[in-house]
Amino acid sequence: MSQKTLFTKSALAVAVALISTQAWSAGFQLNEFSSSGLGRAYSGEGAIADDAGNVSRNPALITMFDRPTFSAGAVYIDPDVNISGTSPSGRSLKADNIAPTAWVPNMHFVAPINDQFGWGASITSNYGLATEFNDTYAGGSVGGTTDLETMNLNLSGAYRLNNAWSFGLGFNAVYARAKIERFAGDLGQLVAGQIMQSPAGKTPQGQALAATANGIDSNTKIAHLNGNQWGFGWNAGILYELDKNNRYALTYRSEVKIDFKGNYSSDLNRVFNNYGLPIPTATGGATQSGYLTLNLPEMWEVSGYNRVDPQWAIHYSLAYTSWSQFQQLKATSTSGDTLFQKHEGFKDAYRIALGTTYYYDDNWTFRTGIAFDDSPVPAQNRSISIPDQDRFWLSAGTTYAFNKDASVDVGVSYMHGQSVKINEGPYQFESEGKAWLFGTNFNYAF
């Protein structure tokens, strides 16, 4: 793995940082901002106003609340992502459960000011990723640990123009933190083989270098990078109410620019830097700085909610994320030298969701939904630290209202990903993944 590849992974770590777990939407985007939404596969989120969590998706929904309302909870993600393959060295590349479980918290508050104005605040996350491989894993030079966390702080306001139109605007502050570690695995053996097959392998110097490379332990830390940074953006929404039973929404979330600063080190001997070998830049354990600017892509979403019967409603969404804005990653040193410049070539991607809600009585509400997440990652750019794939959702949930003020939401989703092939460095992998998500939120209206 080259230093270029290392910083590629670290950049994705920052991008993915908007939540502290394996990303369970396409790319490294996340949706898990409420448990009621989880139960309907996040369908119609820009137009539904059944709890304060919806306001983080569409600030215009603030005008639908006539009392200060609070919601807090978490979604537990239990992924099952497995990797298989065989290294050119003959060692197995099999690794099970590479994505750890995690809790994803959320908190929301909405307060009307009068009949026309209101404000809201939330703590959520919109991107995230985590993968972990054993320190002695054969493909450790491209696996290792990728631990990415973020937190999104949102403050928003809304204005009701008339009975039909409402508008909302929000400000987002995103805190991102990343830790990347890569280990030698069998890379030393592969490098030694390359040297011995080249003309250098016929020289005493080349043979000595090959012997040194072959002696690198599998758990040698060949790359380490960590860092944190703030980024800022905005979001907006429009809500159109045809009548009290039918409403439609258009929402927008801007790019977030994160100027990531990381500390890079490698335990490899600096002698390897003199031979142009396919390994990270060696620092002999010393630390140096690297800088990378990453733009998290903008997102558009159209949503609808139709209460077709006193007890039944349908809701739906189509989200479009401009992943084509993510075309390259470029890292520089403190002196401004380019450490790498890599073409990523992501494509724009969409998410489509459909759900229904059954209002059983004043206490019980039931919901369900399905969704499809289109992956923005081209097949040739997949990696085992971000084994992205198209995903299909099946979701169900319920709300129990204790009284007119307090209620609790419970949601569950099953996500199934396609089996994909990954070519990364000298390795060829196959990856398959699925996940269960469980969420609960408590809601209170003052």
UniProtKB/Swiss-Prot annotation:
Major place of residence: membrane
Cleavable signal peptide: 1-25
Record's keyword terms, sorted: Cell outer membrane, Lipid transport, Membrane, Signal, Transmembrane, Transmembrane beta strand, Transport
Keyword Transmembrane recorded: yes
Cellular component, GO annotation: cell outer membrane
InterPro entries: OMPP1/FadL/TodX
Membrane topology (UniProt): Multi-pass membrane protein
Keyword NAD recorded: no
One GO MF term attached to the UniProt entry: long-chain fatty acid transporting porin activity
Alphabetical list of Pfam families matching this protein: Toluene_X (PF03349)
Location in or out of the cell: Cell outer membrane
NCBIfam families, per database record: PRK10716.1
Role description: Involved in translocation of long-chain fatty acids across the outer membrane. FadL may form a specific channel.
UniProt record similarity statement: Belongs to the OmpP1/FadL family.
Name this polypeptide is given: Long-chain fatty acid transport protein
The organism of origin for this protein: Escherichia coli O157:H7
